[in-house]
Each structure stands twice: as C-alpha cells, then as structure tokens.
C-alpha cells in the first residue's frame, strides 16, 4: 500500500519534470456563448501552442466557463497533439514551404543565421515554442488565429529533411547535398 503511494508520487514528480521542459504560449482567448432556455451562458475558449524549443510542438483548444480552466484544457490538448519537426542546424527550416487551412494560407521561408523570427501573431508563437530562430513567414487570407495556426502546422508537416528525401530516392545524403550546392554552379555554367 505504501509502495503504491510512493510510486504514484514518483510518477507525478517525473510527469511534472517532463511538463516543465515545455514552453507554452497563449495565442488567443475568446468569449463564447451558449444559448439556453433561460438566456445565454457565457464561457471562454483558449488556443494554446506548446513546445520544447528543440523541434517538438503542438497546439490545443479548450473551452470552459472560466479562463484558467479553458487554458488548462487547451494546454492538455496541446500536450496530446505534439509533433516533431526536423530543423536545419537546429535553428531554421530545411526549405521554403506553403500551408493552408480553410481560407488561411501561410508561406514559410528558411532564413540565414541572424535573421530572427519575422512572422506575425499566431505564427510567431508556433516558431518560438518550436525552437526556430531564423524564419520569414507571411500569412495571406484569413487572419483567424485558429486557421493561421492550423495552416502553419500543415506547412510544417509537409517539410522534408535531407535525410528523408535521400531515403525516399535511395541515395546518400552527401550526394543530395552535393547536388544542391553543385546544382547552382551547373546552372550558372549553362
């Protein structure tokens, strides 16, 4: 009996340590209303992005009658929906990518070191929690935070690392990167 209680306490401690490695950002909070027989019942909806700043990121949505409870639900949802994104040199994207969700479209471009995060609102929160330090991003169409976050995740999902491209083509990564560097020189010579 005492051993079970001890083990449960240790599990909780490990879980708290694991949770502390994540950085969370509140992207949007919104007051919502449910129409009931007696009138309107007001609550809150929260959109949270969470990440470990090392390539794992997730987003979650939560609704509750009180703001802190909505944020907690959104954070729990984000922890359940974590995805891994391959980063180049641990600081930027491997290539330029495009993502869309609904009317929201985003363009993400890899950037040289020292550029910083050039992105607006919800996209900036995703990049900061993901650990990207250099990126240029542009959103076109819907400015709805939910659509922008989902479009950003859609774009990140379509990114390929050189290792995955090389595996798909059955070639070595060094060959692929030599073509990438040498390809520009060959085009200039022609």
From Swiss-Prot:
Domain S5 DRBM: 22-85
Gene Ontology process terms (BP): translation
CC per GO annotation: small ribosomal subunit
Any coiled-coil regions, as ranges: none
Record flagged with keyword Transit peptide: no
Database matches in Pfam families: Ribosomal_S5, Ribosomal_S5_C
Complexes and interactors: Part of the 30S ribosomal subunit. Contacts proteins S4 and S8.
Protein name, entry field: Small ribosomal subunit protein uS5
Gene: rpsE
